[in-house]
Amino acid sequence: GRFGGGGSTARSGGVVYAGGGSALQQHAGYADDREQMFEYLRMEVRDAVDETLLWRFCEQSLDQLEWLEALGVPFPPTAVSPRKTSYPEDACTLYFSGNEAAAPFCDGARPAPRGHRVAGAGRTGSVLFGKLRAATAASGAEIRTRCQARRLLTTPNGDVEGVEILELRAPPAIHRLHAMLFELGSWGAMFSPRLVAFCQRSIAALERRWGRALRIRARGGVVLCAGGFAFNTAMMNEHTGWFRVARPLGTLGDDGSGIELGRSVGGAVGEMSRCSAWRFISPPTALTSGILVDHSGQRICNEEFYGGTLGQRMALCEG
């Protein structure tokens, strides 16, 4: 990766969405199955995800969870978070992470908590990614950081046969500065757009000075695994409407470069206007007993909705 690895996953809450009767669900006394999970998710995603793919996700959910546990990702059985919350306390590893218990979703599918939180103190995305990284290293795969994918290499008939990267070949002090600017720009995004722009320019300058272009040939294809484009002002202005005025959440790696690489060789894109802008009103849970209204006094939605849904409904309000 261009930076140190992990991206937004390493900064996340470490919540894995899984269901169908996991050990944690059974321990907490919840009967769940793949069919109920599918019905709920179908209401959530609507036509954004092909139903065949959605069913495969539900069908393989428990296998994925067991695979993570086999890699050492900790999901010890605990009590379900006892209240509506945006993120559970350290003592909980299972909670209602979406709209499962909120109407109208609970009318169409039996509610069950499916947010499996990696055990640990605070946000545990770093624990999740740490285990994945360790397993990757143990497999013998070569891990390269401070390497930016710049261009996909193609054959005359358009097949992708490799990738051109820009590797930061610099003294340790420059690597530390590169990492510091990444952290500063990623965390500072909530406070200062100018700081983000400064860090982006500084990182680009370091890469121009110390970067070395390399070409890597691929025998079995190239997999693009990158973030969104919350930190790309031009793409936000082009695609996202009102969301463009919100402060970006993620890391400086969410610059849309992976999307643009795919498009450069004819890849199709969709749902580019979709954004997740969270607005949590609980805790305190007392606020969910109130009525959330728009500028004209009309109720916006069920106040117990997940923060991502709540934020989206608020953003769609006129005025």
Placement of each model-derived feature along the sequence:
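Conserved redox-cofactor binding core of oxidoreductases
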Residues: 56-212, 233-234
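An anion/pyrophosphate-binding glycine-rich loop and adjacent beta-alpha core
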Residues: 259, 268-319
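Glycine-rich active-site loop/strand segments that organize a redox cofactor
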Residues: 16-57, 69
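Glycine-rich, N-terminal phosphate-binding loop of Rossmann-like dinucleotide-binding domains
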Residues: 20, 167, 226-227
